[in-house]
Structure formats: structure tokens, C-alpha cells
């Protein structure tokens, strides 16, 4: 999926759209997406000016956005239909290494379970095949607005 396609499945826009491309997607099972980290992103003006580091919460948000695309594609819906996937839980988060401008985050998400409208995902973010962040995320569909 190109960035134009990604924008059809996420309501986020600059500066908070954190998925640049989807490389793989298996409906109801998994997604692999990319986030290209650039020095021009606004968080780097304050985190930290002398040694810019992508905040861990932004990495988790990028993973959460990947879960949203997977869920929307799996349910054949889009935000334009008046629905949104909301992050409702974060478990087992680990940060292994810093992410700096110039890095390319590979975001890998697998569905663990879907129970009573709650999706649970196993997620990891890597740079150059090294695990940066791992987590279990949960999201659910809500009416936007």
C-alpha cells in the first residue's frame, strides 16, 4: 500500500501520520509497514536538539497505527465510514535501542486474538533487523466523533 492508500485507512495526518508504506498485509492475520524517520519531524526540535531520539511513545503509536490498518482492512471498513480504531491497552512494552533520524522502522504486527470486539496484537519494531520495541497492543472499533 502506498501512502495514498494508507491515508484511506487512517484518520491521522501530518504530523501524526506515522505509517509511510505497507509492505505486506494478510487479512485477519498480520501486517508489515514502514516508518521512515527524518530529522524534519517536529518531535526532534525538543527530543533532544543535540541528540535527536524518536520518543518511545511515538514508536508505540506507529505500531498502533499499523494495527488500525490491519483491523480496518480485515473488517472491510474505513474511517470515512464513521468508524475509528482506538488503542485501549498496552502490555509488555520493551524498548531495546534508540531510534534516530535516518532510521527506517519496520513495524510488524500479528493478531493474537479477537474477543468481544477487542483486538489483541503482538507487535515489534525493528531497524536493520534489530528489535527496537516489542509490545502487545489492544484496540477496539468506535464510532468517530
Curated annotation (Swiss-Prot):
Database matches in Pfam families: FabA
Sorted UniProt keywords: Cytoplasm, Lipid A biosynthesis, Lipid biosynthesis, Lipid metabolism, Lyase
Regions that span the bilayer: none
Tagged with keyword Cytoplasm: yes
Catalysis performed (reactions): a (3R)-hydroxyacyl-[ACP] = a (2E)-enoyl-[ACP] + H2O
Active site: 47
Role played: Involved in unsaturated fatty acids biosynthesis. Catalyzes the dehydration of short chain beta-hydroxyacyl-ACPs and long chain saturated and unsaturated beta-hydroxyacyl-ACPs.
Record-given protein name: 3-hydroxyacyl-[acyl-carrier-protein] dehydratase FabZ
Naturally occurring in which organism (per UniProt): Ruthia magnifica subsp. Calyptogena magnifica
Amino acid at each position: 500500500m502506498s501512502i495514498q492508500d494508507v491515508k484511506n485507512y487512517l484518520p491521522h495526518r501530518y504530523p501524526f501520520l506515522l505509517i509511510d508504506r505497507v509492505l505486506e498485509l494478510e487479512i485477519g492475520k498480520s501486517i508489515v509497514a514502514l516508518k521512515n524517520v527524518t530529522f524534519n519531524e517536529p518531535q526532534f526540535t525538543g527530543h533532544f536538539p543535540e541528540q535527536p531520539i524518536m520518543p518511545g511513545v511515538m514508536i508505540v503509536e506507529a505500531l498502533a497505527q499499523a494495527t488500525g490498518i490491519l483491523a480496518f482492512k480485515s473488517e472491510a471498513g474505513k474511517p470515512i465510514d464513521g468508524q475509528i480504531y482506538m488503542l485501549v491497552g498496552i502490555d509488555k512494552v520493551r524498548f531495546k535501542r534508540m531510534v534516530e533520524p535516518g532510521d527506517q522502522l519496520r513495524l510488524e504486527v500479528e493478531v493474537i486474538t479477537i474477543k468481544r470486539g477487542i483486538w489483541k496484537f503482538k507487535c515489534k519494531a525493528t531497524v536493520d533487523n534489530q528489535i527496537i520495541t516489542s509490545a502487545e497492543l489492544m484496540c477496539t472499533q468506535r464510532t468517530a466523533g
